[in-house]
Amino acid sequence: MSKETLILLYGGRSAEREVSVLSAESVMRAINYDKFFVKTYFITQVGQFIKTQEFDEMPSSDEKLMTNQTVDLDKMVRPSDIYDDNAIVFPVLHGPMGEDGSIQGFLEVLRMPYVGTNILSSSVAMDKITTKQVLATVGVPQVAYQTYFEGDDLEHAIKLSLETLSFPIFVKPANMGSSVGISKATDESSLRSAIDLALKYDSRILIEQGVTAREIEVGILGNNDVKTTFPGEVVKDVDFYDYDAKYIDNKITMDIPAKVDEATMEAMRQYASKAFKAIGACGLSRCDFFLTKDGQIFLNELNTMPGFTQWSMYPLLWENMGLTYSDLIEKLVMLAKEMFEKRESHLI
């Protein structure tokens, strides 16, 4: 049986590029090499495409993918050179220029099947403010928030936030993930500092009510036939689940499945499915919820390309459902081909 070619795109221009490398290295070790031949392309911090390793069998344990520190510019190619008539692309890219519709649009121009959500749902989910506006239309509960757009009246935004929200308040760039650029404000001074920090990453800022809550996550998989996992819980050893806590300091553990009652579990799974469909998503996503002590559920975020490291919540959630990491990758490839065939069948 001939092997299918799977192209891993990783790295990228966003602040989440290091997470992308970790995810890609985990994926390349989980792939079933009896079924796939793997090509890898590294996207540098400035957007160059670099042709990197190819794997016909499981790489050795010490094999590392190219990074910005080890990049070989002699292997630079034109972005369109990744085209392969019979390949499926797995864009293991997080954040802007990765899961915001940009790379998805590029791959659709090339007419290549790709793992993950489409252009529209990627771009909607990448913007936290737009996501909130869309999900409000289908009745998915969310915490109170205000917004600030660079160039608008900052003093008015701060005044409105102080009048309608109470400390602690979380300030987030609208278009960033992995907790990059997010900070917690406990007074007006730190609120201003938090907005300044967020503006370094985006011109659209979400100012959100902080809640004392457990962080519960649900995995989503499918195209028309959407499946969800039992929830998993992020158990924190830190006050705020930031980028370093997630990926550097290892200050979190996960409880899978989460210890929640059946009614709460079912409600979260239904909200996750409803949110996924509301943004027109396909392939995969992870829905992140807050669960308060009095049982209130709030959807915090919809992540269309969740972390894929061996310790990431998304693959672990599916493993708990009986789907191994390797089988999950095969399922995602199948869903990618299914969506590609549907796109190609549409008249334009």
Curated annotation (Swiss-Prot):
Binds 2 magnesium or manganese ions per subunit. Residues 132-334 form the ATP-grasp domain. Its EC number is 6.3.2.4. It catalyses: 2 D-alanine + ATP = D-alanyl-D-alanine + ADP + phosphate + H(+). Pfam families: Dala_Dala_lig_C (PF07478), Dala_Dala_lig_N (PF01820). It comes from the Bacteria. Pathway: Cell wall biogenesis; peptidoglycan biosynthesis. GO terms for cellular component: cytosol. One of its GO terms (biological process) is cell wall organization. ATP binds at residues 162-217. Mg(2+) 2 binds at E301, N303. Its cofactor is Mg(2+); Mn(2+). Keywords: ATP-binding, Cell shape, Cell wall biogenesis/degradation, Cytoplasm, Ligase, Magnesium, Manganese, Metal-binding, Nucleotide-binding, Peptidoglycan synthesis. Belongs to the D-alanine--D-alanine ligase family. Cell wall formation. NCBIfam families: D_ala_D_alaTIGR (TIGR01205), PRK01966.1-4 (NF002528), PRK01966.1-5 (NF002529). This is D-alanine--D-alanine ligase. It comes from Streptococcus agalactiae serotype V (strain ATCC BAA-611 / 2603 V/R).
